[in-house]
């Protein structure tokens, strides 16, 4: 019986290998430029599209795969990508694209509904792709590969997807952004990226540029049109009431020392109250900052586990309330909603026109913040 099972497994593996071999031809890859990231800039009456592509070498090119930056112009992103295909002699494939970046002049001056529609309606483009905007041009951003010594697209995606929750920065993907521009208040946000040059410490390559990305701010949009920027200080308040975002830090005076307290987990509730206003209830679970994030233990563990005094907890609560209130006032000032205030009304009244048209300025908000020790 065991022998029959082994034979069956071998035959099954062989059949699967044949099916894959038939449906996946080497020429399919050789004829394609696989796009890792796209950048879109305004260039007069046209768009300048920058792509970081991963393409197998052929002809006189180096054997193997490599990443390079390619640019093309067009009236639309679709046209620019077609031009890109003509320039490279290979089909431009968006199926593996993980990042889209809008340059400053493009996202602040132009309605980019056509670009969003093109990407979201594409069968091959991933709805989970990260989408963001940047200060300066997207073309310049993608040309920072040398300074980073690695792929710009993969570096940014890793930051936005993996690190964002650890450093209290909300992040967005294509599907979420598309929905935010069509539902309720039709407002949403994109992470704002900026490149910061740093001093070169490499003695062997003193002329090589070096730097890093900062992504501590967001830009707000309504129906794919720019509304305002939310700076790093205001983004702290936004992060405190954004679900699945942790890592906010607070500096508190504790006796004769400054203590850093970090948010490890939280619970956020947004609901209507009896006065038909919105109550935002935030429960933060905090602990003193540790030298490591995996909590594997060590000689300092017993000291780090000591309880946080109530005075420090009260200080954290006060700081958190101030940061959230500051952000909420800014929301009302520019009349946008990226913290689900309108969603609270929809749960009770449905998607009625008055719910969607309700001004954020007219929504009374009650904030409740509770801080617990881990």
Each model region followed by its residue ranges:
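Membrane-proximal alpha-helical signals and transmembrane carboxylates
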Residues: 2-374
């Amino acid at each position: 019986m065991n022998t029959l099972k082994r034979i069956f497994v071998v035959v099954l593996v062989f059949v699967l290998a044949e099916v894959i071999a038939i449906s996946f031809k080497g020429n399919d890859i050789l004829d394609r430029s696989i796009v890792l990231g796209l950048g879109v800039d305004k260039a007069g009456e046209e768009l300048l599209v920058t792509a970081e592509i991963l393409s197998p070498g052929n002809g006189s090119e180096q054997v193997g795969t490599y990443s390079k930056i390619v640019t093309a112009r067009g009236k639309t992103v679709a046209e620019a990508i077609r031009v890109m295909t003509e320039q490279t002699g290979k089909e431009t494939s968006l199926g593996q694209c993980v990042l889209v970046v809008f340059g400053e002049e493009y996202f602040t001056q132009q309605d980019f509904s056509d670009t969003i529609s093109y990407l979201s309606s594409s069968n091959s483009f991933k709805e989970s792709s990260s989408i963001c905007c940047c200060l300066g041009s997207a073309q310049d951003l993608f040309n920072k590969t040398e300074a980073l010594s690695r792929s710009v697209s993969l570096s940014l995606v890793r930051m936005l997807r993996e690190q964002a929750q650890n450093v209290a920065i909300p992040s967005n993907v294509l599907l979420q952004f598309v929905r935010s521009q069509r539902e309720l208040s039709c407002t949403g946000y994109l992470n704002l990226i900026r490149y910061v040059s740093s001093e070169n410490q490499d003695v062997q390559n003193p002329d090589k540029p070096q730097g890093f990305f900062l992504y501590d701010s967001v830009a707000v949009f309504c129906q794919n049109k720019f509304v305002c920027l939310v700076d790093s200080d205001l983004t702290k308040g936004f992060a405190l009431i954004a679900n699945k975002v942790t890592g906010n830090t607070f500096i508190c005076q504790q006796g004769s020392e400054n203590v850093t307290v970090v948010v490890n987990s939280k619970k956020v509730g947004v609901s209507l109250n009896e006065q038909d206003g919105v109550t935002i209830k935030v429960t933060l679970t905090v602990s003193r900052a540790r030298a490591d994030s995996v909590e594997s233990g060590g000689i300092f563990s017993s000291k780090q586990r000591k309880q946080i005094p109530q005075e420090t907890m009260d200080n954290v609560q006060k700081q958190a309330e101030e940061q959230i209130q500051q952000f909420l006032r800014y929301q009302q000032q520019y009349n946008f909603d990226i913290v689900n205030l309108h969603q609270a009304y929809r749960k009770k009244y449905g998607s009625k026109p008055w719910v969607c048209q309700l001004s954020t300025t007219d929504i009374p908000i009650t904030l409740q913040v509770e801080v617990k020790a881990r």
